[in-house]
Amino acid sequence: VTLTKKQLFLDFRLQTQACARCPYSSIRDNPIAGNGEYRSPILIIGKAPRKRDDEEGVVFSGRAGKKLERMLTKAELDLEKVYRTYLVRCYAGREPQFGEFAAFKKCQPHTVNLLKLMRPTAVVICGYTPFKWLILRWTREVVDEVGFYRWIGRTVRLKEVWGETKFFIIQGPAELSTKRDPDAESKSIEALKTMKAYVVASQKGEPTPLEMFDLKRRPHTRSQQETFGWS
């Protein structure tokens, strides 16, 4: 029996809601598979749910959601017409730290399944942690949180098990108040505008010139394995 995309997506949500891969599953209220239009060519990925997200079962609720919606509006994008999810889908009573490998590694199959299911034209990476786990972990690039600011506004092309993906990198909306890079919001909005133009052109079958960084998947070094717990 061939399932429709809607049925496959429903199955994905049910699997996420029933997940007990890591200890966070015992303290969450609502595991968050995602929200928005599942048929969208655009997928937005943030770090992890906060308390209000967990209470409402909605991705990017509260102030972070308002900031993201504001940026999308400036790029002439509709929040409800894109699909949003998190790298970690359960609230831990606080934000998970990067060193908590269990949460990120256990949730990784859900993210990969979502990418395979959606096969989005564009993936928007919100912040340092999704950037590290979805892009850097497959390469030999080493970028710390300070170095990440140089990547905001850039586009990365990476070939993975779900196909070639264009990642558009923006600052996470919850971190936009930082003084470290006062231009992070404007660079993020420009990245969203570039992403929209790319998606529209792709849908029309038109040429889509993009300034991209090509990253190839490579074996991890011993240092990366020890530092980040990557295999």
What is the meaning of each model-derived region?
Residues 2-217, 228-231:
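A polyanion-binding, active-site-adjacent surface
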Residues 225:
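Cationic, low-complexity basic patches in intrinsically disordered or flexible, solvent-exposed regions
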